[in-house]
C-alpha cells in the first residue's frame, strides 16, 4: 500500500510550521517531512507530532547559510561546518524519532575540482553515516535534476549509487 507524506515546508504555508502538522493530519496524512525544522525546539516538535498522530519521516540537514547554498558536503573549507551542522541535525532527528536525514552536497561552479569534491563528499557522508547509525538515523542522498538545480553536485542516481558503494 502506498503511503504519502506532506512536505510541510511547502504545504499549508499560510500557517506556522507547527500548525502545519495538525493541518496535515486533518488532510489525512499520517506522515510529514520538513526541510528546515530547526527553529522549533525538538521537544515541541516531538509533542506536536505526537498530538497530531503524525510521524516525521524525513528532515534535511542544514544546507548552509549563504545565498544559493544547497549543502555543505563537497567543500574542503567547510568540513567542520558540515560536521557541526550534520551532528546537530542527527541529534534533532533522533530527538523527534525521525529516522531519515537528507544530506545535501552543494553547488559547484567553474572552479570546482569535481574529483576532489567527490572525495570530500564521500568522506563526509561516511562520517555522517557512522554518526547517524549510532543515533538510529539513516543518511539519505537525493540527486537533484540539473535543469531546476544547475550546478548542484549530485545530479544522477548512478552517481549516488557509486558514492554509496564506495563507502
Predicted regions and their residues:
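Alpha-helix N-cap/helix-start motif
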Residues: 14-17, 42, 114, 149-153
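Residue-level preference for long, well-ordered alpha-helices that form the structural scaffold
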Residues: 75-78, 82, 114-117, 121, ...
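Flexible, active-site-proximal loop/turn residues at the rims of small-molecule/cofactor binding pockets
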Residues: 38, 107, 145
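Hydrophobic alpha-helical segments and helix pairs
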Residues: 89-114, 118-121
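Short beta-strand segments at enzyme active-site cores
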Residues: 34, 58-59, 98-105, 136-143
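N-terminal pre-domain/capping segments
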Residues: 1-98, 126, 165
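Acidic/histidine-rich catalytic cores of soluble enzymes
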Residues: 19-31, 46, 51, 119-167
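A short acidic, helix-capping loop that chelates divalent metal ions and anchors anionic groups
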Residues: 65-75, 109-114, 146-150
Amino acid at each position: 500500500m502506498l503511503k504519502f507524506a506532506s512536505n510541510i515546508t511547502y504545504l499549508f504555508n499560510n500557517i506556522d510550521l507547527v500548525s502545519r502538522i495538525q493541518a496535515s493530519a486533518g488532510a489525512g496524512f499520517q506522515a510529514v517531512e520538513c526541510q528546515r525544522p530547526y527553529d522549533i525546539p525538538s521537544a515541541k516538535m516531538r509533542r506536536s507530532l505526537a498530538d497530531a498522530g503524525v510521524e516525521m519521516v524525513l528532515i534535511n540537514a542544514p544546507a548552509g547559510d549563504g545565498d544559493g547554498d544547497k549543502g555543505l558536503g563537497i567543500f574542503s573549507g567547510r568540513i567542520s561546518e558540515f560536521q557541526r551542522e550534520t551532528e546537530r541535525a542527527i541529534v534533532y532527528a533522533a530527538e523527534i524519532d525521525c529516522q531519515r536525514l537528507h544530506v545535501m552536497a552543494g553547488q559547484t561552479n567553474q572552479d570546482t575540482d569535481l574529483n576532489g569534491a567527490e572525495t570530500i563528499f564521500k568522506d563526509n557522508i561516511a562520517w555522517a553515516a557512522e554518526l547517524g547509525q549510532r543515533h538510529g538515523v539513516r543518511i539519505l542522498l537525493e540527486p537533484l535534476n540539473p535543469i531546476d538545480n544547475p550546478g548542484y553536485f549530485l545530479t544522477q542516481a548512478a552517481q549516488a549509487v557509486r558514492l554509496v558503494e564506495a563507502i
